[in-house]
Curated annotation (Swiss-Prot):
PANTHER family: PHOSPHORIBOSYLFORMYLGLYCINAMIDINE SYNTHASE SUBUNIT PURL (PTHR43555:SF1). The active site is at H52, H99. The keyword Transferase does not apply. GO terms for molecular function: ATP binding; magnesium ion binding; phosphoribosylformylglycinamidine synthase activity. It is found in: Cytoplasm. Its EC number is 6.3.5.3. GO terms for biological process: 'de novo' IMP biosynthetic process. This is Phosphoribosylformylglycinamidine synthase subunit PurL. It comes from Salinibacter ruber (strain DSM 13855 / M31). GO terms for cellular component: cytoplasm. The keyword Ligase applies. Monomer. Part of the FGAM synthase complex composed of 1 PurL, 1 PurQ and 2 PurS subunits. InterPro entries: PRibForGlyAmidine_synth_PurL, PurL_linker, PurM-like_C_dom, PurM-like_C_sf, PurM-like_N, PurM-like_N_sf.
Length: 754
């Protein structure tokens, strides 16, 4: 570090605008301070008032979401992640976050540090991460740039997670032209903690010491938060220095040291250093605790020479945390972190001044009110909204605008859909991840509608899933978001769990675009509708706006991370694969289900007819609740041999996947006569689940449903050792061997990336 400060640039309006602040925001800063900010203060405001840190364009909308529940142990925004009581003295911390912009310019490091950051949020709560999931979106794999991004992101996730020692147990990958220049990389972490061992983030006690723990500080990631709050354009490649560099082995040491320090009772409060680094941690901890801090930046361990206060405050170097402890506990902290070869350097003190003050060799370089920077007094905007003009065209679509299928075309159509990268096997992805490390994984990727992990020592498990179909949200933002929540919960239900709470990652376009903001607002309404109906409160999450590229905005994509509890880990986990020859097949639907089958918004319409049109598929939330409740009851009673929800690709793909995932089994099923064959087989209306039961349990299934008047079980057929045979009305339409279905399903992704 230099002994004396270099002369910082003179702060003026032009410099503020270069930092991403608006004219109005700079005027607000001048008014609040009554003076021109220092260069370091300007940097602090620029990152903390960025959308990435402040949620200034989303807070008003997010406050409308359901956030209360009997099992929730932390309020939204109060801690680093959501915290849910799952019984037996255990709590689950879970959260999903985005790393979209960094991954667009540096896919490997961008994805890797996204994984590292979300895990830190979890173990900062005192919870040990037990599994990870991801939700990824890319453009067409026909483009070489997309293949480069896809490969880099998957390797980054795999290398970091595998080295860190936490299994990646599930996720989803979609490929749509709308994500061509702006991939989405959303990472979710789930951890477990004893309810009496949780750690807090608020710095509440003046006189406590402020300790920087973990890795040394460098120049990587400076203004990463600001970069994440701007659109991607042709010049974004120049922002590679804004992408952080992660080290999973250091993070593993940080995990063990931090959990040990929390167990030993020497951590008063703790905050991960993510976006905006020391700045965000210090200001957020002070704002939450109603206190202040004095920070001595010349004490910060650095790995590069000549770093200035501005750079130290804004660095986003990874694998660092800010710990507040009682006086006298810093020696114990230093011993614990030193044992793991990590820094534990006292850099400041909690104060009662209500100011965060930064010093360099006792010279004050910044003094700001944390409430103005990270608390309740940050700017909050409600932007103009306008219904998108494109909806006039998409809603004009009628299913009859495209020709129906002839029976002879069904097999080719089905294999085409099974070979679509959106539906096809993601084995190429999963095989790059360690899915079994730590031996908690009961059901891994692809084996069920959701992953299931063991809660050791309890007899329980967790069912976890990420979900969102951006095409649905594009066509109908409110209903599409409802479907995202409903399907995530339905997947957890089909895997044997009871959904209890959700986290969300809101990926949308430029909030200054009224059409993009309208979609965001409607999607938040939809998430709220479904969360309330399904009794799955929102525990927190992430907002990523400005997801635009030179060709336009992404599909609005509110990714849902759903948490469910499996009450009996030995009997309830349920596979998506057929289990036994002779089992009876049923389709669970709402009792009065008579909604016209349509192909609107379907993978069939997109893949076969190259159309993204119509409305989002039908969903009635009361019907959805009824079907999920019935499915949960049937699984608890031990009647269900396999369960798979009807979603992308419709009923035909659902049945085909059940065959593909089984060990040499097939099925014979008969569907009612339909006005349109394509809609009956490939329409994606919601609230449908295919289950199989032992032949002797068919009557028991009917009896069990008497307590669920809103649901009926339609007999489809039986499990066989032969092909997949489908009859619609009286007409056979499909006779395909398991091998013929499996080949395109397994080959699509490897063929596309090579």
């Amino acid at each position: 570090m230099p002994d004396t400060l270099p002369q910082p640039p003179e702060v003026d309006r032009d410099l503020a605008l270069d930092h991403g602040l608006t004219d109005d925001e700079y005027d607000e800063i001048l008014d609040r301070l009554g003076r021109t900010p220092t260069f370091t203060e300007l940097g602090i405001y620029s990152v903390m008032w960025s959308e990435h840190c402040s949620y200034k364009n989303s807070t008003a909308l997010l406050k409308t979401l359901p956030t209360e529940g009997d099992q929730l142990l932390a309020e939204v925004g109060e801690e680093n992640a959501g915290l849910v009581d799952v019984g037996d003295g255990k709590a689950v911390a879970f959260k999903i976050e985005s790393h979209n912009h960094p991954s667009a310019v540096e896919p490997y490091e961008g994805a890797a540090t996204g994984v590292g950051g979300i895990h830190r949020d979890i173990f900062t709560m005192g919870a040990r991460p037990i599994c990870a999931l991801d939700s990824l979106r890319f453009g067409s794999l026909e483009e070489s740039r997309v293949r480069y991004l896809f490969d880099g992101v998957v390797r980054g996730i795999g290398d970091y997670g595998n080295s860190f020692g936490v299994p990646t147990v599930g996720g989803e990958v979609y490929f749509e032209d709308a994500y061509e220049g702006n991939p989405l990389v959303n990472a979710m972490s789930v951890g477990v903690v004893d309810t009496d061992q949780t750690a807090r983030a608020a710095a509440e006690t003046p006189g406590h010491h402020v300790i920087l723990v973990g890795a040394a500080t460098g120049r990587d990631g400076i203004h990463g938060a600001t970069f994440a709050s701007a659109e991607i354009d042709e010049d974004s490649e120049e922002d590679r220095p804004s992408v952080q560099v992660g080290d999973p082995f250091t993070e593993k040491l940080l995990l063990e040291a931090t959990l040990e320090a929390i167990r030993e009772g020497v951590v008063g409060s703790i905050q991960d250093m993510g976006a905006a680094g020391i700045t965000s941690s210090a200001f957020e901890m002070s704002a939450s605790g109603g206190t202040g801090m004095d920070l001595h930046l010349d004490r910060v361990p650095t790995r590069e020479t000549g770093m200035t206060p501005y750079e130290i405050m804004l660095s986003e170097s990874q694998e660092r945390m800010l710990v507040v402890c009682e006086p006298g506990d810093e020696e114990a902290l230093a011993e614990i972190y030193g044992k793991w070869d990590l820094n534990a350097q006292r850099i400041g003190t909690v104060t009662d001044t209500g100011r965060v003050r930064a010093y360099w060799d006792d010279e004050e370089v910044a003094t700001l009110d944390p409430a103005h920077v990270a608390g309740d007094d940050v700017p909050v905007y409600e932007r103009d909204t306008e219904r998108p003009a494109y909806l006039e065209e998409t809603r004009a679509f009628n299913t009859d605008d495209v020709p129906d299928l002839a029976p002879a075309e069904v097999e080719d159509t089905l294999t085409t859909l099974l070979g679509s990268p959106n539906i096809a096997s993601k084995r190429w992805v999963h095989e790059q991840y360690d899915t079994m490390v730590r031996t908690n994984t009961v059901v891994g990727p692809g084996a069920s509608d959701a992953a299931v992990v063991r809660l050791k020592g309890t007899g329980k498990g967790l069912a976890v899933k990420t979900d969102c179909n951006g095409r649905y949200v594009y066509l109908n933002p409110r209903r599409g978001a409802q479907i995202a929540v409903a399907e995530a919960a339905r997947n957890v239900t089909c895997a044997g769990g009871t959904p209890v709470a959700l986290t969300n990652c809101c990926n949308f376009g430029n909030p200054h675009n009224p059409e993009a903001y309208w979609a965001f607002a409607k999607a938040v309404e939809g998430m709220g509708d479904a969360g309330r109906a399904l009794d799955t409160p929102v525990t927190g999450g992430n907002v990523s706006l400005y997801n635009e590229h030179p060709e336009g905005a992404i599909f609005p994509t509110p990714t849902i991370g759903m948490l469910g509890v499996v009450d009996d880990i030995d009997t309830q986990p349920t596979a998506a694969a057929l289990q036994n020859e002779g089992d009876a097949l049923f389709l669970l639907t709402p009792r009065d289900w008579c909604h016209p089958e349509r192909t609107d918004g379907s993978e069939y319409l997109s893949t076969v007819h190259d159309r993204t049109a119509g409305d989002a598929p039908h969903l009635d939330l009361d019907e959805e609740v009824a079907v999920q409740s019935a499915t949960q009851a049937l699984i608890r009673e031990g009647l269900v041999q396999h369960a798979h929800d009807v979603s992308d690709g419709g009923l035909a793909v659902c049945l085909a996947e059940s065959v593909i995932h089984s060990d040499g089994l097939g099925l014979e099923a008969t569907l009612p006569a339909a006005d349109r064959l394509d809609a009956a087989l490939f329409g994606e209306a919601q609230s449908r689940v295919v289950v199989s039961v032992r032949p002797d349990d068919a009557l028991a299934l009917d009896a069990a449903l008497t307590d669920h008047n809103g649901v009926r079980a339609r007999r489809l057929g039986a499990v066989t050792t032969g092909p997949l045979r489908l009859t619609v009305g009286d007409e056979p339409v499909l006779d395909a061997s398991p091998a013929a279905l499996t080949a395109p399903y397994e080959a699509a992704l490897p063929d596309a990336v090579t």
